[in-house]
Amino acid sequence: MMTLKEAENAIVEEFSMYEEWLDKYEYLIELGKSLKDYPEAAKTDDRLIKGCQSRVWLDHEVKDGKVFFNADSDAIITKGIISLLIGLYSGRTAREILSSDFSVVEKIGLKENLSPTRANGLVSMIAKIREIAQCNI
């Protein structure tokens, strides 16, 4: 597994291949399609991330000291965003997650190219991932 920095750099490099934001959105949509199936029974209110315009469910499990995330959303771009985040942070220790400054979203221009409500949702997703990591130190 790549280090977190290596994974972040790979994402920055991947996004830099696309000049137009429309192409970057298409890439996010494809990322969202790569999420593993999320059971309907798991789409409960306690797994909903508050602060997102779209519904985003996030759960996790800890195995061998590493936090593994699973997520889904009812909106395709939002699903891609959460897929990007869990692709980076799933399978890492809580300390690794908390050591991240999550600047990758700024480096790829994601936050500034989202609508204000989606940008708020992104902040909420990051906060929830950090909260889960904090609870599993």
Model features per residue range: what roles?
Residues G65-V67:
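Hydrophobic residues embedded in beta-strands of well-ordered beta-sheets
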